[in-house]
Swiss-Prot record:
Keywords: Cytoplasm, Protein biosynthesis. It is found in: Cytoplasm. It comes from Tetrahymena thermophila. The lineage of its organism: Eukaryota, Sar, Alveolata, Ciliophora, Intramacronucleata. InterPro entries: eFR1_2_sf (IPR042226), eRF1_1_Pelota (IPR005140), eRF1_1_sf (IPR024049), eRF1_2 (IPR005141), eRF1_3 (IPR005142), Peptide_chain-rel_eRF1/aRF1 (IPR004403), Ribosomal_eL30-like_sf (IPR029064). This is Eukaryotic peptide chain release factor subunit 1. GO terms for cellular component: cytoplasm. One of its GO terms (molecular function) is translation release factor activity.
Length: 435
């Protein structure tokens, strides 16, 4: 479940990043571009009243054309808000207005959606651009990591998310030191010391469970144990430590201090391990992909044409796609037969006339979409799971450079030589610089 949640989060991040890029590059001819963000606890009526008031003020705009465009955009926003009886649980994001397309023509744009997680920003603008920086809060991708710093004086519990560290819990302890007396006193004090250490270790384990497991679910992606003595090593091996947390240990480090000074040192020493864990899902899935290729299992596919054909056939179970893949999905219509077909080509082939002829018939260009964006919206329709791959890990970089940046795991073995793709008129792999 945790892996699936992470995968879904990656897909949502991809959609937000693409939307931000698209809106940031969009321009209008006037000041009729409405940006509206409503946080979860704010009433829809408050925003409706705000825009209605702004509509009245817009009558003072001297330029008639701009005034009409501004008021049209506000009316569109108000009409869209009427469809919502209340603010969605995660808030509401809306962008609308008249914008210029690639040909410089003015078109109407309207986007509204509930973000995948709560957005705590309240925003309204109506000017010459869309305000998208506030959507960046939805892209906080760094997972939280837990830290336990323990020594002879006590234990500290903290988490680290991105550059933000938070102390979650701490307690002090007084442990008896080694006693210099001999005879029976020595044995008794040694026994007391062992008992006190055992009780301390047990409390560390109990507080760790209370701190890093909530509602029976682990709330950190990995754990770092730190300390100046043997306590951290004993913690990693004791049966008292919750096994759900024990399997999350990614690093054990020696630090010179306890408390927050020890935490700072532990964060510094664990940086490499934290980076590796962030890409562990990516590393695992690509390593499995490479293993299948190495043994010629017949259960994986790569390359744009073969991968997309098998996805459309419902054969692919898991699809892997480089998040920056620039491949286009082009929808064409035969002007005579009205048959609809799709091809997958790089951007520099978009205006090549050979892609828009079928014998003597011309093919009309109906729609052009980025393939990765199309996959993010439609992958589930084919019963597949989608993994977005970066080039930030060694495995991801190899997948992008050596396997076209797209591939998949098949539900069953397929003879790839017999794939028939009626639209496979372009050998994508021969084109350089397609990623």
């Amino acid at each position: 479940m945790e892996e699936k949640d992470q995968r879904q989060r990656n897909i949502e991040h991809f959609k937000i990043k693409k939307l931000m890029t698209r809106l940031r590059n969009t321009r209008g001819s006037g000041t009729s571009m409405v940006s509206l963000i409503i946080p979860p606890k704010k009433q829809i009526n408050d925003s409706t009243k705000l825009i209605s008031d702004e509509f009245s003020k817009a009558t003072n705009i001297k330029d008639r054309v701009n005034r009409q465009s501004v008021q049209d955009a506000m009316v569109s926003a108000l009409q869209r808000l009427k469809l919502y009886q209340r603010t969605p649980n995660n808030g509401l994001i809306l962008y609308c207005g008249k914008v210029l397309n690639e040909e410089g023509k003015e078109i109407k744009l309207l986007i509204d959606f509930e973000p995948y997680k709560p957005i705590n920003t309240s925003l309204y603008f109506c000017d010459s651009k869309f305000h998208v920086d506030e959507l960046g809060s939805l892209l906080e991708t760094d997972p939280p990591f837990g830290f336990i710093v323990m020594d002879g004086q006590g234990a500290l519990y903290a988490n680290l998310q991105g550059n933000t560290k938070t102390v979650l819990n701490k307690f002090s302890v007084e442990l008896p030191k080694k006693h210099g007396r001999g005879g029976q006193s020595s044995v008794r004090f040694a026994r007391l010391r062992v008992e006190k250490r055992h009780n301390y270790l047990r409390k560390v384990c109990e507080v760790a469970t209370q701190t890093f497991i909530s509602q029976d679910k682990i709330n950190v992606q990995g754990l770092v144990l730190a300390g100046s003595g043997d306590f951290k090593n004993e913690l990693s091996t004791t049966q008292m430590f919750d096994p759900r947390l024990a399997c999350k240990i990614i690093k054990i480090v020696d630090v010179s201090y306890g408390g927050e000074n020890g935490l700072n040192q532990a964060i510094e020493l664990a940086q490499e391990s934290l980076t590796n864990v962030k890409f562990v899902q990516e590393k695992n899935v690509i390593s499995k992909f490479f293993d299948c290729i190495a043994i010629d299992s017949g259960t994986v596919v790569y390359g744009v044409q073969d991968t997309m054909q098998l996805l459309l056939d419902g054969v692919i179970e898991n699809i892997l796609c480089f998040e920056e893949l620039t491949t286009l999905r082009v929808t064409r219509k035969n002007k005579v037969t009205e048959q609809i077909t799709h091809i997958f080509i790089p951007p520099n082939e978009l205006n090549n006339p050979k892609h828009f002829k079928d014998g003597e018939h011309e093919l009309e260009k109906i729609e052009v979409e980025n393939l990765t964006e199309w996959l993010a919206e439609h992958y589930s329709e084919f019963g597949a799971e989608l993994y977005f791959i970066t080039d930030k890990s060694a495995e991801g970089c190899q997948f992008v450079k050596g396997f076209s940046g797209i591939g998949g795991f098949l539900r069953y073995k397929v003879d790839l030589e017999h794939i028939v793709n009626p639209n496979d008129e372009y050998n994508y792999e021969e084109e350089e610089g397609f990623i």
